[in-house]
């Protein structure tokens, strides 16, 4: 709850306080509220005073009740202090079947008289699912795409995108019911040591980041189409990153993952800017407000800003201390950690950029985009191919099955490789999971699954012997019988 106020105020309190206007009386909102029209969308904070900003009504109860209740528990785990968090039901990153215990912070006397706890309890009841996240951003995109008003405008949108659950494709459609595809984390939020599990999680994360990127692109396009781009300051940043180093905490920075968690993107566009530059200095979120003030050529003498403008040549600190769990860690000024992360990601996905590259992890991904009948299976001791009809894909429903599970029952040798083809073209590579032996999870290239009816083919290889029985999560079964491979009773050829 410290990061967003730091962005909007340029200061960090020594102790955590509620991210509300009363605790941050000096902010971009109070600075610009008298001169600008305020278009503000705050997902989890209330930093803009109500006399300056209209507060959106919380999502209606028509949203699926169980999902809202689940989000209450998740948010309490994120926001409540340890003494209350210990009493909550255990969660990892899932969204199901723990809502009955959500009353710990919503009822009774928990938080009574404490502004921070009262704010946390109130916000816990107002969080919706990912569709509401998109609505927040899209409402700002729509407003910014209109011709400029005579009165200058200040847009501020804080969304929890691209937080888990990771379930949205770049076009915004759901690609999985998230409750059925939990992330491979232990009870403390640490990744499994199985790299394949983490690579699959990264695939899902990347797709959802693509959705956010598309919405930001829509904002830029809207500003340009409305003739406003050259007169607008645009700042895009995040409050934290996510570790994908196997065996580390997903959210808490450690020596092995410090750069992943604490190095976040910061993009600044200034009015009239005609070329881009890259600045490798260590910047902080508290530098955003001074930078905006510098662009607008405004200053307030009695403000005690802790950050610096990134545009006036001020020498920035060479090292930055960050709070990581219960300890303080130092982020070094070099880019070695970030470059190492980029090299690891490139090794995980070596077959090109774009969404096809994300669907093609590891050496086995080299065949994504090729026809099944052209595959060279080498000396594989076992191979099986089956066709399964996919129900009509219709993205207007808000869903496209880009995540497919293939389970291999342990009645024979496990396949070494699983590839899934759509209409006889390899569209994704299956990665074996650690906690569920025989389960392979596949992300499909969205370009190879357009709207319409399709046939899906599962191609399994084994270098060590005859294959066992395969099961598609959708319900179709691939089974070896004396008559050959069968799907739902239909005999196939090998």
Language-model features and meaning:
Residues 1-494:
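Catalytic domains that recognize anionic headgroups
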């Amino acid at each position: 709850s410290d990061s967003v106020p730091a962005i909007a105020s340029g200061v960090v309190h020594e102790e955590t306080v509620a991210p509300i206007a009363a605790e941050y009386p000096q902010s971009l909102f109070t600075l610009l509220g008298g001169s600008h029209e305020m278009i503000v969308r705050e997902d989890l904070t209330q930093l803009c005073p109500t006399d300056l900003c209209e507060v959106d009504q919380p999502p209606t109860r028509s949203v699926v009740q169980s999902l809202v209740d689940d989000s209450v528990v998740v948010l309490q785990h994120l926001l409540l202090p340890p003494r209350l968090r210990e009493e909550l039901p255990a969660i990892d990153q899932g969204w199901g079947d723990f809502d009955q215990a959500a009353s710990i912070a919503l009822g009774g006397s928990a938080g009574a008289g404490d502004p921070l706890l009262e704010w946390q309890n109130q916000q816990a009841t107002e969080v919706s699912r990912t569709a509401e996240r998109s609505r927040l951003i899209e409402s700002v995109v729509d407003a910014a795409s209109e011709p400029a008003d005579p009165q200058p405008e200040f847009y501020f949108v804080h969304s929890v995108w691209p937080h888990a659950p990771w379930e949205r494709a770049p076009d915004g459609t759901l690609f999985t019911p998230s409750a059925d595809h939990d992330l491979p984390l232990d009870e403390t939020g640490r990744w499994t040591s199985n790299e394949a599990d983490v690579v699959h999680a990264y695939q899902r994360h990347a797709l959802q980041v693509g959705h956010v990127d598309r919405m930001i692109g829509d904002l830029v396009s809207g500003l340009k189409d409305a003739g406003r781009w050259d007169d607008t300051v645009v700042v895009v940043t995040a409050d934290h990153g996510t570790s994908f180093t196997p065996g580390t905490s997903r959210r808490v920075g450690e020596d092995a993952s410090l750069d992943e968690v604490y190095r976040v993107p910061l993009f600044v566009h200034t009015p009239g800017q005609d070329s881009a530059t890259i600045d490798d200095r260590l910047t902080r979120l508290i530098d955003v407000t001074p930078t905006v003030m510098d662009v607008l050529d405004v200053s307030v003498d009695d403000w005690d800003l802790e950050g610096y403008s990134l545009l006036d040549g001020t020498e920035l600190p060479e090292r930055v201390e960050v709070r990581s769990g219960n300890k303080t860690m130092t982020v070094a000024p070099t880019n070695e950690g970030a470059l190492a992360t980029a090299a690891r990601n490139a090794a995980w996905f070596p077959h090109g950029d774009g969404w096809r590259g994300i669907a093609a992890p590891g050496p086995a991904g080299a065949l994504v985009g090729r026809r099944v009948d052209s595959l060279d299976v080498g000396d594989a001791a076992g191979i099986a191919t089956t066709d399964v009809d996919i129900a009509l894909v219709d993205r207007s429903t808000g869903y496209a099955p880009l995540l497919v599970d293939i389970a291999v029952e342990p009645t024979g040798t496990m396949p070494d490789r699983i590839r899934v083809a759509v209409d006889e073209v390899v569209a994704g590579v299956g990665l074996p999971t650690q906690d569920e032996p025989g389960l392979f999870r596949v992300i499909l290239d969205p370009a190879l699954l357009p709207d319409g009816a399709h046939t899906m083919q599962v191609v399994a290889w084994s270098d060590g012997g005859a294959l066992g029985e395969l099961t598609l999560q959708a319900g179709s079964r691939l089974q070896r019988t004396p008559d050959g491979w069968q799907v739902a009773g239909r005999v196939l050829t090998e």
